[in-house]
Amino acid sequence: MKSEEKSTNKEKQTLIIRKYHQYLKLEKALSPNTVDAYQTDLQKLLHFLEGEGIAILDTTLDDLQHFASGLHDIGIHPRSQARILAGIKAFFQFLGMADYLEGDPSELLEGPKIGFKLPEVLTVEEIDRIISAIDLGTNEGQRNRAILETLYSCGLRVSELCNLKISDLYFDEGFIKVEGKGSKQRLVPISSRAIKEIRNWFVDRNGGWKIKKDFEDYVFLARWGKNISRIMVFHLIKELAKKAGITKNISPHTFRHSFATHLLEGGANLRAIQSMLGHESIATTEIYTHIDRHRLRSEIIEHHPRNIKYRKEREIH
């Protein structure tokens, strides 16, 4: 019986790896060399898990930390360790997007300290360009606009957006109820603009969209009548960003980063932002103070009269 189970797990793993290869090649449009590098690094993890008797879909954070420690122990350079672990995290993000896993065991996986990288953030103008790129003449146009306005208005994780229910909407009070990590619920303010776009979407939704049984309460639907998936939202945003001429590497989570950064720049209290994002620790939210300082420095360098004078002098010489 154990032999049959092991064989089934192996077949499933082979299928997953094949789909991941296709995803890297076709969806991410990576070069053959980059795809090979991802696959080589992934094979290191698979070899480790096989030696430990762990199925890929049963992998825990502890398993990944054990694997990461092994990279250090055999003397792999910190930058190479970081590259390998980044590839591993990308693989588990794919498993989440493709609905193979509910949670991401690699989310809290830390690599070696090789420098601090700030998350990508969109400007208000860039967000407007992305939303304006939506074609409202298509069947999904109004739904897509409501999705983006909700992501930016509420700072939701993509999984929270996909699982949002009509019964969670309290428009008269200006709030929505969100179920976050660990099934923890929170109330999040929602903008009048997002409310308007969701109501417009409901007109379309009720005017011909088929809705499958048991999915009637979901806010955002796919064409086949079930709630929209994370990978669909991911591809939607990638497509719209390309159409809008945005070259930054963005994802649904970029809207969450932008939401928090713009609130902080507007003077919002860090604790209030923590509550809206559903962060357990204020330390997680403090990343946005780094972004704010980084942008502030860029503004000063760009507009300070001494810097302007220096740039002009350099142009003359």
Per-range role (PLM):
Residues 1-317:
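Conserved catalytic core of the tyrosine transesterase superfamily
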